[in-house]
Structures are given as C-alpha cells and as structure tokens.
C-alpha cells in the first residue's frame, strides 16, 4: 500500500546513518499506520509483525536507488546519492506531524521500549476495513459484538529487540563487550527531533552506562557535545553542571575510565539537594 511505501522510505531517509533491513522490518512492525495498511484484520495475532517479504520486495524494486553501505561490519540501506536523498525528503518527509511521529517511533525502537515481550496497542478502523470489504477481527478473549464501534484496540507483541548500550558475552568479564553502535548513532538524534526531553535526559544523558560506554570507546568529547545539545533543548541546570564536572575530571577518567563512578559521586553528591535531577 501507499502508506507502507511512504513510511518505509521515510524511515530510511530520516535515519541518521541509514537502516539495516532487519531494523526497517522491526520499525515498520511498530508503526500502526503501516500495519493498518498491510495487515488483513482477520490475521491479527501475537506476535504482530509485517511480512519480511514486503521489505525484501521493496528493496528489490528500488535496486540501484537504495544501496548498501558497510559501517562497522553492519550493512545499512541508504540512498545511492545525495540527490535521491533530497528528493526522498521532499516526497516522504513533507508532513511535519508525520515526521515528528516517525522520529518518536525510531527513538522508541532504539530505546528498546517495546522489547522483551512488552505489548503495544494496535488501533484499527473498522470503517477502513469495511471499505476494503473485509470483516473486522474479533479478539477470541472478547466475544461481544464490536459492530457499534468505529475502532478496536488490542495490544500485541511486536517482537523488537532489546537495545542495551553494550552487548556482553560473559557477565563475569565485564571489560569484554561489543558496543551497540546503532543505538549510539541514532538514539540522541531522534530523541532531540521528536522533543522527547525526559527520555533524552534520563534515558541517555543521566544514564551512567551511556556515559561510561562513550568514555570507554574514546568518545568523551562526543558525550560532552551530546550533553550540551541536551542542555540547549531542555535548559536543565543539572546538565550544565554535569558538563562542567566532566570537563574538570576529563584527564583522570580518560587515564582510568573505571574511576568515573567515584569521581562523579565525589562531585555530584554534595549538590544533589540543589540539583535533584542529578540523583538519576
């Protein structure tokens, strides 16, 4: 359907570094507008996902326009050139409300908000399905008639993955890990553009795991840039204090990242009464 194509190509276009085929399939499975366009209502069941064939067919039809780019051994789908990217922006990302909603959904995906079996509500419009001459789905646990309602709401598992900052093979060896570079690349970008300031503050900037990982992979200055960006979005005084503190301890923690926790506690604990959000 048209909405499937517009959303799919919109997500590829707005992603900071492109998307993998699996990521696109996951994200489209979270998008109720897409599901309402491609899922036959009598097929609604757990888990609720779009067919992999739809994404594969779309890629096949756009061969030469969508190309593969290897980034840290991950294969990402991107437009073949900047001209195509600009055209796609005009075609698929012209509606501000849709763009805001799509950035928010991408942020939820990279936050892992719907992973681990957490179910997301799916609302479908019976009138839309009636116009397609399709009888609407009845939940087996709710046998009462829904004929008088214009829409029904049920929750379904979309089977999207957990999104930790790092993947550890052995919990007994915490220094051996693989960084979730996709989350590192995309999350802050989509949180800022969707205006999800609480998630930006407490899910990222005030998250010790994020800061520690950034330092471990040599991205201390990038972490400071992200904190400054978050401050410009929120004007929260705690963020300004955190950035100042990190600049003061930069030499120490770069020399010994394991000292980060002690250094932060030493400087932040005395001021949590006046800066309460630092407790996070």
Residue spans of the language-model regions?
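Short alpha-helical "packing" element that flanks the helix-turn-helix/winged-helix DNA-binding module
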Residues: 4-11
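Short helix-capping/hinge SLiMs at alpha-helix to coil transitions
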Residues: 12-17
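A short acidic, leucine-rich amphipathic alpha-helix
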Residues: 20-28, 264
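Intrinsically disordered, low-complexity regions enriched in proline, serine, glycine
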Residues: 20-22, 36-37, 88-89, 200-203, ...
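Accessory beta->alpha helical hairpin/"wing" motif in late/C-terminal subdomains of nucleic-acid enzymes
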Residues: 22, 69-86, 204-222
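C-terminal leucine-rich, beta-strand-based interaction scaffolds used for sensing/assembly
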Residues: 31-148, 152-155, 163-176
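Extended acidic/polar alpha-helical scaffold segments
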Residues: 112-280
